Curated annotation (Swiss-Prot):
Keywords: Antibiotic resistance, Cell inner membrane, Cell membrane, Cell shape, Cell wall biogenesis/degradation, Hydrolase, Membrane, Peptidoglycan synthesis, Transmembrane, Transmembrane helix
Subcellular location(s) per record: Cell inner membrane
Signal peptide span: none
Lineage: Bacteria, Pseudomonadati, Pseudomonadota, Betaproteobacteria, Burkholderiales
The protein's name: Undecaprenyl-diphosphatase 1
Organism of provenance: Burkholderia lata (strain ATCC 17760 / DSM 23089 / LMG 22485 / NCIMB 9086 / R18194 / 383)
A GO MF term: undecaprenyl-diphosphatase activity
Amino acid sequence: MDWILICKALILGVVEGLTEFLPVSSTGHLIVAGSFLNFNDSHAKTFDVVIQFGAILAVCWEYRQRIASIVSGLPSRPDARRFTLNVVIATIPAIALGLLFEKKIKAVLFSPVPVAFALVVGGAIILWAEARQRERREPPRVMSVDELTPLDALKVGIAQCFALIPGMSRSGSTIIGGMLFGLDRRVATEFSFFLAIPIIFGATLYETVKDWQAFTVDSLGLFVLGAVAAFVSAFVCVRWLLRYVASHDFTVFAWYRIAFGLFVLLVGYSGWLNWA
C-alpha cells in the first residue's frame, strides 16, 4: 500500500473526526482537504462518506448505555418510543431532500469555492443566532431530550436540511436551529449527536451499495484506516464538546468558519492553488 495514500487517509480521517460534530462542516473540510491533498478521484466522495461511519461509532460508544436503554425499552416504555419517534421525524426531511437532489448537489456544490461561501454564510448565521440568544430573557423551553415534542423534532429536522449544502454543517444546522426553537444548548447538542446516527449510517450504506466497485483490496485498507482515525478523533471531540457547551457559546466557531472560508476564497482567486 502506498505510504503517501496511507498518510492522506489518516489525515482525512482525523479531519472528519474533529469536524463532524462541531458546527464547522466536516463535509466542507473534507472537500477542501481532499482537493489540497489531491485526494479527489472518482471514489473520493465514497471514502468521505465511509469514514463518517468511524466518527458516528464514536457517538454510539459514548452513548452506548443510553442507546441500549432506548432499544430495550421500546416494547414497554413510552419515553423510549417517543424519543425514537422524534429521531425518525427529524431524520425524514433531510433524507427525502437528499434523495431528490443528490446528483445536482454533488455536481454543483461539491468543490472548495461553493464550500467557502457556505462556510462564511453559515458563520454569519451563527453570529446572528448567538446574538439573539444573548438578548433572550426567558430560559430555554426544552431542558432535556426527553421533553422534546414531535413538532420540536420536525423543526430541527427541517433545519438539518440546510446541511445538504456542503459547508453549512449538519451539527451547526441542528444545534443552532434547535436553540432558536427553544432547546437548551446542551439538549440541542445531544439531540444533534443522536440525529447523526441514522443519517450517517444510512449515507454509508447507500454509498456502499451504490459505489461497491470502490471497495477493492487496496482501497478497503485505506477506508479502514480513515475510519479508525475518524473514530479516535471524534471520540475525543465529542467528550470535549459536551464539556465546552456547558459554559461557552459557538461564537468562536462562527469566526473560524468565516476566516477559513475567506482563506479558501483568497487562495483560489489569487491563483496560489487551483481549487478544482
